[in-house]
Curated annotation (Swiss-Prot):
Entries under PANTHER family matching the protein: TRANSCRIPTIONAL REPRESSOR PROTEIN YY, ZINC FINGER PROTEIN 143
UniProt protein name: Zinc finger protein rotund
High-level lineage: Eukaryota, Metazoa, Ecdysozoa, Arthropoda, Hexapoda
Zinc fingers typed C2H2-type, residue spans: 488-510, 517-539, 545-567, 573-597, 603-625, 634-656
Biological process terms in GO annotation: cell fate specification; chaeta development; compound eye development; imaginal disc-derived leg morphogenesis; negative regulation of DNA-templated transcription; negative regulation of transcription by RNA polymerase II; regulation of transcription by RNA polymerase II
Biased composition (Polar residues): 161-176, 198-230, 242-269, 813-822
Keywords, comma-separated and alphabetical: Metal-binding, Nucleus, Repeat, Transcription, Transcription regulation, Zinc, Zinc-finger
Low complexity bias: start-end ranges: 177-188, 739-762, 770-790
Length: 946
């Protein structure tokens, strides 16, 4: 029984017009609302639209009203019931005699013994119906899908508006609204069922649940946009029909005969038989159900659209089977463990849980066969690369089902321990499981709740498939159960992984080998994938490079180039030994020839052309030819770069030499976080009683807005800086840098002169507290003495010369009048020192001892001075003025705070910088003290800072 189905996604439903009147109550065109999740929509398959009611097919059975006025296309004659031109039950390509006979018998019992003639066996046919709407010439149906022999109102749809259901009856004169969380039922396990009034005039001929809230009857109709998920049943609610052939004889008011009025006798007579019929019918109907039947569309496209939303929902920890928690369920998500029957989302009619003895034996069988046949139907597409199954259906379909397996011929884990594609299941296998399910009632009921696993299908790129047999996975289906949908195949083996991280972790196993890339056609192995790719051309006979002279073909371009030299006579490789005029067409020949000239180097390497003067040098060279030579085992501890040879690492470390003797290794910490803390400390420490803070200079203001960390300065044993850093030696000329620095410093001096007046006023405001005179215009010679006077206010800091100048940098825009030790006010005069003062301090001879690696102190995380090696890259780390005006191409360099021993109880909130550290930078330009740049040129005291 082939079920033509299609996964509808939002854009399709959003522009799917339906202009047919619904029970003569609507004459307008309806556009369904946008839906971002897939819906398995039942739509008609027909050769052409039928104008007006279809002509009934001759029927051998008594007239039985059907569930909707639908036209049908009957390629093969079959006993089908019609009443007044209305549609018939949908039976698709299968002999349905037994099920139809049982359905007719059930109908006879339900209506009180009315006669019903069993349907005779018939050849396979294809009859499908319109989804809940009469078809006319103006109807536009874009896709086709399966119309099961069940009322269309039980097709699953995602509920809307927090699980609120709006159920519209067939005559559109009443809308019954329910809430899945607030209903009361005598049978808590009864699945949600559509309400039905006792009156026969209130039968649900074509009913649906609107996605929107309850609306007036004139605005409610059933369409593709309706959320058709059965609402909770009231105490007097009843269950819809399980088969459209089981209806009473009332032609005008067809009411399903299996409606439950909670009468035990009636339940036993009607619903028990109906449930058994539905089980057999649904199991047969699931025989050949495809995943997608959209014309001209890749079956995987509908899944890609909603994959991220589904995965995000499952990661929240809410069970997907709880309608109160999630309010929705998908037909591929396994069994339902409570408050919901499997048939609600499996496109089969629901059966009340109050009669589980007749209905619970088949849910898992229906779902398993449905999913198995979905894969079987598209098996050809799988082989062609259109769609690739990734064992998403094998988790719940095989494990813990009490004998209810998929019946796949390939089996689980078949083919080299990998996960095989589930396919080749026959109709007989599905029938077997349907019968087996009837014999394993209790086991299936227990397994239904125990095996309610959450399985979500995932799209797979066909290019990532392992081979013609399907997907091979190192861990079976579990390795491919998650991820974003992409599949990553190992280049060294056939294994496929769902995430790039898993692939990288797996690759490390191969990288332990000297040559992990092994040829599958021969025993050769290679160190990298490119070599293997070139080698594979030999086995495949691929020779893309052809000589235009002799038409000879080659697998590699280098081979062709060498071959062309035989025609041209070109010998580009010439011997450089004095007096030797030989030349060669190939480099290897030149290398071999060069040995004859190395008479002073008797130690020759047998693997290459190199010769050495002594044996230790040769022994050191030989390991370079070992098989693991491609492994980068030598790693730089400063920048993390790795090299294959120790000599390469040594050369690389020389680049760090001029910096490693001045700074410690990389320390953890976020520059942005530390800068933010410093800015917060600067803003939060301002005392309103001290008056408004002085306006910052433009450069510092821009620096604060950019959120850059403050400048760090630390001691060094050298009294000079390199004029051009090793990393930027080729970027700028030393003279140009000096000239640009000179211009920048002149701009800085002008800014400082404007700032001095405001700083002096601020200093007068604070210094009466401590008796310290203002220091804005003091000669440079007195600056050090005044700083030593301030040092007496910090007796807890040892050694004595240490004094914090952090307020100059960490808090450039606000006076620090509320420091914890009470000495923040006296530092305000130095908030912006004039340029001559800063120059003098920078020119003071250093008293700090030589750099000692053992004296490196750990930088605290609360320091306002961020190690510059943790800042952003150079040219961007100090962009406190526009990049066009920033000519400094140096790398920012940071040094350790060597002798800072402060008491946390009485110290500033941030780490302090001692006077020794400031003195140590005798040749730093003035721009550094203002935070403009770190590196400059070496100048002596008293010289201009050019």
């Amino acid at each position: 029984m082939i079920m033509h189905g299609t996964w509808y996604k939002g854009p399709q439903l959003a522009h799917h017009p339906h202009s047919n009147p619904h029970n003569s109550s609507h004459g307008h065109s309806d556009y369904h609302q946008f839906r971002s999740y897939p819906s398995f929509v039942v739509t008609p398959y027909h050769d052409g639209h039928v104008q007006g009611p279809a002509t009934p097919t001759p029927c051998t059975a008594p007239p039985t009203p059907c569930n909707g006025p639908v036209p049908v296309s009957v390629p093969v004659s079959i006993p089908v019931c019609h009443t007044g031109g209305q549609g018939s039950p949908v039976i698709v390509e299968s002999s349905f005699a037994i099920a139809a006979a049982a359905a007719a018998a059930a109908a006879a019992v339900a209506v009180g013994g009315s006669s019903a003639t069993p349907l005779l066996p018939s050849p396979p046919i294809k009859i499908e119906q319109v989804f809940g709407e009469p078809s006319s010439l103006g109807a536009v149906v874009e896709d086709y899908a399966l119309g099961l022999d069940c009322p269309v109102e039980h097709t699953f749809r995602k509920p809307h508006n927090n699980n609120g259901y709006s159920w519209s009856t067939g005559n559109n004169n009443e809308v019954v609204s329910h809430s899945s969380n607030g209903h009361t039922n005598n049978h808590p396990t009864t699945p949600p069922t559509p309400p039905n009034e006792a009156s026969a005039t209130q039968a649900t001929s074509v009913s649906a649940i609107n996605l929107n809230q309850a609306q007036p009857a004139s605005q409610t109709r059933s369409n593709f946009g309706s959320s058709i998920k059965s609402p909770p049943s009231e105490p007097d609610a009843v269950t819809a029909a399980t088969c459209k052939s089981q209806e009473n004889n009332s032609g005008q008011n067809p009411t399903p005969n299996s409606l439950s009025d909670h009468n035990p006798a009636h339940n036993l007579n009607s619903n028990s038989t109906a449930a058994a019929v539905a089980a057999a019918a649904a199991a047969a109907a699931a025989a050949n159900m495809p995943i997608g039947g959209v014309q001209g569309q890749n079956p995987t496209q509908g899944l890609v659209h909603w994959m991220s939303a589904v995965m995000a929902e499952h990661m929240t920890g809410q069970t997907h089977h709880d309608p109160g928690a999630v309010g929705m369920h998908y037909m591929w998500n396994g069994n339902v463990d409570h408050a919901k029957d499997i048939s609600d989302y499996n496109l089969w009619p629901p059966t009340p849980r109050s009669h589980q003895h007749a209905s619970e034996h088949h849910p898992m069988s229906l779902k398993q066969e449905y999913e198995a046949k979905m894969n079987d139907h598209h098996h050809n597409n799988l082989q062609k690369g259109h769609f690739l199954d990734d064992n998403r259906l094998e988790h719940h379909a095989v494990t813990g089902q009490g004998g209810l397996g998929l019946g796949a011929s390939n089996g689980v884990g078949g083919g080299g321990g990998g996960a095989s594609v589930v396919g080749n299941s026959s109709l007989g296998a599905s029938s077997h499981h349907a019968v087996a399910a009837a014999h394993h009632h209790n086991q299936a009921v227990a397994a239904a709740s125990a095996a309610a696993l959450l399985v979500v299908p995932q799209p797979i790129n066909a290019s990532k498939m392992g081979g013609p047999g399907g997907v091979s996975s190192v861990a079976g289906g579990h390795a491919t159960g998650g991820g974003s949908g992409r599949k990553y195949q190992c280049k060294m083996c056939p294994q496929i992984f769902s995430s790039k991280a898993d692939l990288q972790l797996h690759t490390q196993i191969h990288m332990r080998e000297a040559k992990p890339y092994k040829c599958t056609q021969c025993s050769k192995a290679f160190a990298n994938s490119s070599y293997l790719s070139q080698h594979t051309r030999i086995h495949l006979g691929i020779k893309p490079y052809r000589c235009e002279i002799c038409q000879r073909k080659f697998t590699q371009l280098s081979h062709l180039q060498q071959h062309i030299r035989t025609h041209t006579g070109d010998k580009p490789y010439k011997c450089r030994h004095p007096g030797c005029q030989k030349a060669f067409s190939q480099l290897s020949n030149l290398q071999s020839h060069s040995r004859c000239h190395q008479t002073d180097k008797p130690f020759k390497c047998n693997s290459c052309y190199k010769c050495f003067s002594d044996e230790p040098s040769l022994l050191e060279h030989i390991p370079k030819h070992k098989e693991s030579k491609h492994l980068k085992t030598h790693i730089c501890q400063y920048c993390g770069k790795s090299y294959t040879q120790e000599t390469y690492l040594t050369k690389h470390m020389q680049k760090h030499a001029e910096r490693t003797d001045k700074r410690p290794p990389i320390v953890p910490g976020s520059a942005a976080a530390i800068a933010a803390a410093a800015a917060a400390a600067a803003g939060g420490s301002a005392n309103p009683a001290n008056g408004p803070p002085p306006p910052p200079n433009p450069a510092q203001h821009q620096r604060n807005n950019l959120g850059l960390p403050p400048v760090s300065i630390a001691p060094s044993d050298n009294g000079y800086w390199p004029k051009v850093s090793p990393d930027s030696a080729a970027a700028a000329n030393a003279m140009e840098v000096m000239h640009q620095q000179q211009q920048q410093q002149q701009q800085q001096q002008q800014q400082q002169q404007q700032q001095q007046q405001q700083q002096q006023q601020q200093a007068h405001h604070h210094h009466p507290q401590h008796g310290v005179p203002p220091q804005q215009h003091v000669p440079p010679q007195q600056q050090q003495q005044q700083q030593q006077q301030q040092q007496h206010h910090h007796p807890q800091q040892q050694p004595p010369p240490q004094h914090s100048m952090e307020a100059h940098y960490a808090q450039p825009t606000a006076p620090n009048g509320s420091q914890s030790n009470g000495h923040g006010a006296e530092l305000q005069p130095h908030h912006r020192m004039p340029d001559p003062v800063r120059e003098d301090i920078a020119s003071t001879p250093s008293a700090v001892g030589p750099y000692d690696a053992a004296s490196i102190t750990k930088t605290t995380s609360n320091s306002a001075f961020t190690p510059i090696n943790s800042m952003p890259p150079h040219l961007n780390s100090l962009s406190h003025h526009p990049m066009a005006q920033r000519p400094y191409l140096y790398d920012a360099i940071s040094f350790p705070n060597k002798n800072v021993n402060q008491n946390n109880a009485n110290a500033f909130p941030n780490q302090l910088i001692s006077l020794h550290q400031i003195r140590n930078y005798a040749h730093q330009p003035a721009g550094l003290m203002a935070g403009e740049h770190l590196l400059g040129v070496s100048v002596g005291p008293g010289k201009d800072k050019g």
